[in-house]
Amino acid sequence: MARRPFAIVILAALGFMRPALAADPIRIMILDGQSGGPYHAWRLTTQVLKKELEEAGLFQVEVVTAPESGGNFAGFKPDFAKYQAVVLNYDAPDWPPDLQASFEQYVKNGGGVVSVHAADNAFPNWRAFNTMIGVGGWRGRTENAGPHWFYRDGALVSDTAPGAAGSHGARLPFQVTVRNAEHPITKGLPKVWMHAGDELYANLRGPGQNMTVLATAYSDPSNHGSGRDEPMLMVLSYGKGRVFHTTLGHDVPALSCVGFMTTFQRGTEWAATGKVMQPIPASFPTANTVSYRVDVAAMDPAFKNGPR
């Protein structure tokens, strides 16, 4: 499949001043502290995610950093109930049972969850977590984690064939297709929009319970893809809790895409409150135009020429 030509719109910081904080802000925790490897620079991406939420003027954001795997979790007991949603910029192999139980109870009681990119690599053996996020990849996941999920002929389907979970090609721009235009997160978005260069996750596996796919992207075999329309944005329910799962956002240039920023801000608001009041910015990407914030991309010290 030939790659589509596209344009890039570079947006300067002008006009993106942070608005005054709402009188009753939405309380958000960003949880970080570990990644499966150095390729996910969580210390850097957490600062970008925090900036993007604070720019919306709706959120009061606190970063909570967990001990690294194998560290001392005895004193790590976050008060999840203080927050309306927890943003996971975090990929760890396991948690102590009491911490798992605390988080499960938080979500069952109505706490929101936002899973960003490699957060869906975490906790392969924690059944409740995998039910919360719907699908995940890597860290030894196989068919035991659940089927592959993807779109075919306009419908969500599953494939129980054996095999590993999780793959991606090179970080290239790709089109995102909205599959549910009536959900509060995606309502008003273009049917198709171009995302900046990013890892396009494919072949994820999981239980897929109570999962609605909001948007997909075609995983092109010419870039080591699956040849399927893979889930990019999903929403789920777990008890009374709402979960927004985005597979986008590998690095700072990908996070600087206005498409990522907008869906992340709106998805976090929905996970926390069940509604979305934020407008779609005029700078949102089109079907053939990548739109990104140069000031955000420049938060990466390696940034030189912008997103791919």
Give the positions of each predicted feature.
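N-terminal secretory signal peptides that target proteins for export/translocation
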Residues: 1-3
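Extracellular ligand-binding/catalytic regions of CAZymes and related secreted enzymes
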Residues: 23-26, 43, 55-56, 78, ...
